[in-house]
A protein has these predicted regions:
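Bacterial N-terminal signal peptides
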Residues: 8-19
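N-terminal leader/targeting segments
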Residues: 2-3, 14
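Flexible coil/turn and secondary-structure edge motifs
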Residues: 3-6, 20-200
């Protein structure tokens, strides 16, 4: 009976340890990228359709104002950028590949604007989480600048991530929740079609 109890406890311990280890391994597979490429509704809609991306959260970072509201950010006075924080499985997609999509999905040569969205809150920016991301971002920027893919000079900034403030709930999954909204129909949808992320 004692032997049985010991074996049962050992088995339970091994199961708990296995589950903990599996969860820890899964967490180690997840990396986060924080990018500014114009309106965060667009950035979110693009990356939500990329294989290997687990979650995308719209928010604000890069400024000094604490807990900014959308109204404050779009005033252009907070210094914050509309950004998307992208959680991805690095066994399926790399940070390098995330940046490739970033370059393709917006115009990194227009200073403080994307299309009709104008202001410092729409600036092109890569916010790195660690030294490895910083090095990859700098190399990627250099490669794109040297490749002359873009006619004009790239103005994307590479900045250390400080505090990321999650945007209000109504901004999250905006395209999915408001597919018929004018901005979605005339701005986001054409972008998704151009990138072959949605069927015509």
């Amino acid at each position: 009976m004692k032997l049985f109890s010991f074996n049962k406890l050992s088995l339970m311990f091994l199961i708990i340890l296995f589950n903990f280890t599996s969860s820890e391994e899964k967490l180690n597979q997840i990396e986060i990228a924080t990018l500014g490429a114009g309106c965060f509704w667009c950035v979110e809609a693009v990356f939500e359709r990329i294989d290997g991306v687990i979650d995308v959260v719209s928010g604000y970072t890069g400024g000094k104002t604490k807990n900014p509201s959308y109204k404050e950010v779009i005033s252009g006075k907070t210094g914050h950028v509309e950004t998307a924080q992208i959680s991805f499985d690095k066994t399926k997609i790399s940070y390098d590949q995330i940046l490739e999509i970033f370059w393709l999905s917006h115009d990194p040569t227009t200073l403080n604007r994307q299309g009709n969205d104008v202001g410092t809150q729409y600036r092109s920016a890569i916010f790195f989480h660690n030294l490895n991301q910083k090095n990859i971002a700098e190399r990627s920027l250099k490669e794109k600048s040297n490749s002359k893919i873009f006619k004009n000079r790239i103005v994307t900034t590479i900045e250390k991530l400080d505090i990321f403030y999650e945007a209000e709930n109504y901004h999250q999954d905006y395209f999915n929740n408001n597919p018929n909204a004018p901005y979605c129909q005339y701005i986001i949808l054409p972008k998704l079609k151009k990138l072959n992320l949605i069927q015509n």
